[in-house]
């Protein structure tokens, strides 16, 4: 077993890929009987300090319908200088530059350790990075001041040749001219009128040099100053002026009467930002960064009226079809998101307010373009300030951890087809023989566009086996998949990262144990969870839970060992043993349970779940719990109410929150001030240890989690109590004896009851 775990670990570290199955069933029928689809989690730009990019272009297969890239799985005839493509078997000539290759002098892309390789493309004009700030001015004074300071700080973090623009909005929308003369000029647009891209470009005077739409290319350097210099300027030229301009920003001057919301034209402001970049820099790396402190209340994209007595829509309103602005607003933002994705730009949303800001309607903007979504209470909190600062963090080479305008192309050997992808991407509608008719996620294509990428951005990619049951893949063969990610690096170079992997085929009837041993239950749980969350966007919550339950029961029936009608005989092997508890916690998670969460919160949680890597996704599904005591070093404990003991401190990491919880006795000792007495030095250290560990997590994570410090009986202890498995409740407390954790006041079923029920259904011949 350890060997497969090591194999999975090594592949993730080298290639950024985790497959649900690491030995593949050799026919379509057998693959469907496996219940969990053949799929993988791919982190296209996983950080690899040991992988410097090579300074030449990749060698492509000459077959026009294939164009796979030369890789270690290809067969090479060194004497004839020919190579055979491992996907279509086409024989190809090596280019002249490869004349000196031999068995002992191989290029990097043929060496097995370079199953992932990155190429640096030298040709083609380079375009600077573009950052367009879209700022809400209907904020409270201290909030606006804090936001202005964060924006001024961010200017110092941008590369000097980056282009920057500024749009502000309240009741009206202002597009600011950024000149070096120090005179403030802006174009003002009504916040109620929807404008086409052409109208926006005409009004801003961008049409003379705006390129014909069919020329999908970046503006050439000599065109750029004329086209956009008034609105997008290199930071090194206007740093001082823009800092002053941001400092002078005032609150929206339109009066807001009592009982009314400010009039916010978010939809028009975003539309103008998209139109401005569309006309000046199509297919160039650009970020639209929207900062908003409340819901859009007028014009296209409004999500609530200005009357405060009318609350913004809740889940209850949506279920009752009582959210009157939702469909129209969602349509507006979807149209903007699709236009932005077509142009290769991405949209970030930074929403800080105590009430909802319309993230439900606007979620498609970051979701489809690979932008960030940050949600907080105020721009004046360290949560926002540090999260915003982290966007501009640098990697080991001193480059930004951001990439732009990526396309992901997936190629498969002929026994496989691509069913779809789930992640921050849009389809490029590239059909081909390797595209399946059955869609899972965003399907019907073998290529996707990801406009904004960072080293942790992860996609779930789903496949299906082609071969019929009566003509399975021959034994001993290997199936192969190649992932080709072309992107604009933050240094503005064009790069291509290529990952080529292979796995063995096995006959599911004679080698089921072999397939079973190669099951990656962590990857499978995340891939199934992504499918569930994807379905939850368009289906009723209970239907999604029923679907997940059915899949779990079928999986247990297929791979469990049991005697018919005898639940006590049920066993799962080590490679499946954790999977049911992942599903138990997933069912209770905020991704599938909307109770107690606003529509905006649900959208925020789902946004992050659909893009994080495997480790972070597992923390979201099943939070990690550490226990601190006098009995030894901190240790991970079960996410269970039995772990909540009076003489322990607990640290829980849910990804979105870090909770420190003091047990009853510890809380009393702290209240009595023992930590300040020299003879109780060890107690002081015990209190400090979880704080230090929490600080470490807070420093590393994006977005920065909410930090909660609570104790037994504290109101915020609910964050911990709602996550742990309620093995002890008010119903069964007295059956447990005395010193065993805290009872949870809930009617939710515990993991034990869930497992008992699962065993009963799995062994029943009726189900």
From Swiss-Prot:
Gene Ontology CC: COPII vesicle coat; cytosol; endomembrane system; endoplasmic reticulum; endoplasmic reticulum membrane; perinuclear region of cytoplasm
Keywords tagged on the record: Acetylation, Cytoplasm, Cytoplasmic vesicle, Endoplasmic reticulum, ER-Golgi transport, Membrane, Metal-binding, Protein transport, Transport, Zinc
Predominant localisation class: membrane
Binding site for Zn(2+): 61, 66, 85, 88
Biological-process GO terms, alphabetical: COPII-coated vesicle budding; intracellular protein transport
Entry-annotated residues carrying N-acetylalanine: 2
N6-acetyllysine modification, residue list: 564
Gelsolin-like repeats: 634-720
UniProt-listed InterPro entries: ADF-H/Gelsolin-like_dom_sf, Gelsolin-like_dom, Gelsolin-like_dom_sf, Sec23, Sec23/24_helical_dom, Sec23/24_helical_dom_sf, Sec23/24_trunk_dom, Sec23_24_beta_S
Recorded GO MF terms: zinc ion binding
Disulphide connectivity of cysteines: none
Gene3D superfamilies noted in UniProt: beta-sandwich domain of Sec23/24, Sec23/Sec24 helical domain, Severin, von Willebrand factor, type A domain, Zn-finger domain of Sec23/24
Cellular localization per UniProt: Cytoplasmic vesicle, COPII-coated vesicle membrane; Endoplasmic reticulum membrane; Cytoplasm, Cytosol
Membrane-related topology note: Peripheral membrane protein
Transmembrane segments: none
Family as reported in the entry's similarity comment: Belongs to the SEC23/SEC24 family. SEC23 subfamily.
Main function: Component of the coat protein complex II (COPII) which promotes the formation of transport vesicles from the endoplasmic reticulum (ER). The coat has two main functions, the physical deformation of the endoplasmic reticulum membrane into vesicles and the selection of cargo molecules for their transport to the Golgi complex.
Complex and partners: COPII is composed of at least five proteins: the Sec23/24 complex, the Sec13/31 complex and Sar1. Interacts with SAR1A.
PANTHER family documented for this protein: PROTEIN TRANSPORT PROTEIN SEC23, PROTEIN TRANSPORT PROTEIN SEC23B
Name of the molecule in the record: Protein transport protein Sec23B
Organism placement in taxonomy: Eukaryota, Metazoa, Chordata, Craniata, Vertebrata
């Amino acid at each position: 077993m350890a060997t497969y775990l090591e194999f999975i670990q090594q592949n993730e570290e080298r290639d950024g890929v985790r497959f649900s199955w690491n030995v593949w069933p050799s026919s379509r029928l057998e693959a469907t009987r496996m219940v969990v689809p053949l799929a993988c989690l791919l982190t296209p730009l996983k950080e690899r300090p040991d992988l410097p990019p090579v300074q030449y272009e990749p060698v492509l297969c000459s077959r026009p319908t294939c164009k796979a890239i030369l890789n270690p799985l290809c067969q090479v005839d060194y004497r004839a200088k020919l190579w055979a493509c491992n996907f279509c078997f086409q024989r190809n000539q090596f280019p002249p530059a490869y004349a000196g290759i031999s068995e002992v002098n191989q290029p990097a892309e043929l060496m097995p350790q370079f199953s992932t390789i990155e190429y640096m493309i030298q040709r083609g004009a380079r375009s600077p990075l573009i950052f367009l700030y879209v700022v809400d001015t209907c904020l409270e004074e201290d909030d606006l001041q804090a936001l202005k300071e964060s924006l001024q700080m961010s200017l110092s973090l941008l590369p000097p040749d980056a282009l920057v623009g500024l749009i502000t909005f309240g009741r009206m929308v202002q597009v600011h001219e950024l000149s070096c003369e120090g005179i403030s000029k802006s174009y003002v647009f009504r916040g109620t009128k929807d404008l086409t891209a052409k109208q926006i470009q005409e009004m801003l005077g961008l049409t003379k040099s705006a390129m014909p739409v069919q020329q999908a290319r970046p503006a050439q350097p000599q065109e750029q100053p004329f086209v956009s210099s008034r609105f997008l300027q290199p930071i090194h030229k206007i740093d001082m002026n823009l800092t002053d301009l941001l400092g002078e920003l005032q609150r929206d001057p339109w009066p807001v009467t009592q009982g009314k919301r400010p009039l916010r034209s978010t939809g028009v402001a975003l539309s103008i930002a998209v139109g401005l970049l569309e006309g000046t820099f199509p297919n160039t790396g650009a970020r639209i960064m929207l900062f908003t402190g409340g819901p859009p209340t007028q014009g296209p994209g409004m999500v609530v009226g200005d009357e405060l007595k009318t609350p913004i829509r809740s889940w209850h309103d949506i279920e009752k079809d009582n959210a009157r602005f939702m469909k129209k607003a969602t349509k507006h933002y979807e149209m903007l998101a699709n236009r932005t994705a077509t142009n290769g730009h991405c949209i970030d949303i930074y929403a800080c307010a105590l009430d909802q800001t319309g993230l439900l309607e606007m979620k498609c903007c970051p979701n489809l373009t690979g932008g960030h979504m940050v949600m907080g209470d105020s721009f004046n909190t360290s949560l926002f300030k540090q999260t915003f600062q982290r966007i501009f963090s640098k990697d080991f080479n001193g480059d930004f951890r951001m990439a732009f305008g990526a396309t992901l192309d997936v190629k498969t050997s002929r026994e496989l087809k691509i069913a779809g992808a789930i992640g921050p991407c849009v389809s490029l509608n590239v059909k081909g023989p390797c595209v399946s008719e059955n869609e899972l996620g965003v399907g019907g294509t073998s290529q996707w566009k990801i406009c904004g990428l960072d080293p942790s951005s992860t996609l779930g990619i789903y496949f299906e086996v082609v071969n019929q049951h009566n003509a399975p893949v021959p034994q001993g063969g290997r199936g192969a998949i190649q992932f080709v990610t072309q992107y604009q690096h933050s240094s503005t170079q064009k790069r291509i990262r290529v990952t080529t992997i292979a796995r063995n085929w096995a006959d599911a009837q004679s080698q089921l144990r072999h397939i079973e041993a190669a099951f990656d239950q962590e990857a499978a749980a995340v891939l199934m969870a992504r499918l569930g969350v994807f379905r939850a966007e368009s289906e009723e919550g209970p239907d999604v839970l029923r679907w997940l339950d059915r899949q779990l029961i079928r999986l247990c029936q297929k791979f469990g060992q049991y005697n018919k009608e005898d639940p006590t005989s049920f066993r799962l092997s080590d490679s499946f043993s954790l999977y049911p508890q992942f599903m138990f916690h997933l069912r209770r998670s905020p991704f599938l349970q909307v109770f107690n969460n606003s529509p905006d919160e649900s959208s925020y949680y789902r946004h992050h779940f659909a893009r994080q890597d495997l480790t972070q996704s597992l923390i979201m599904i099943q939070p990690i719990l550490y226990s601190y005591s006098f009995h030894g070093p901190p240790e991970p404990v079960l996410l269970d109410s039995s772990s909540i003991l009076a003489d322990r401190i607990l640290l829980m990491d849910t990804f979105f929150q870090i909770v420190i919880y003091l047990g009853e006795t510890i809380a009393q000792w702290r209240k009595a001030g023992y930590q300040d007495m020299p003879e109780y030095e060890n107690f002081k250290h015990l209190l400090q240890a979880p704080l230090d560990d929490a600080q470490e997590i807070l420093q590393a994570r994006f977005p920065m989690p909410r930090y909660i410090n609570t104790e037994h009986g504290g109101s915020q202890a609910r964050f911990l109590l709602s996550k742990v498995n309620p093995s002890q409740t008010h119903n069964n407390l007295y059956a447990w004896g005395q010193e065993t954790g805290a009872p949870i006041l809930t009617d939710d079923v515990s993991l034990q009851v869930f497992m008992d029920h699962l065993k009963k259904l799995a062994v029943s011949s009726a189900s």
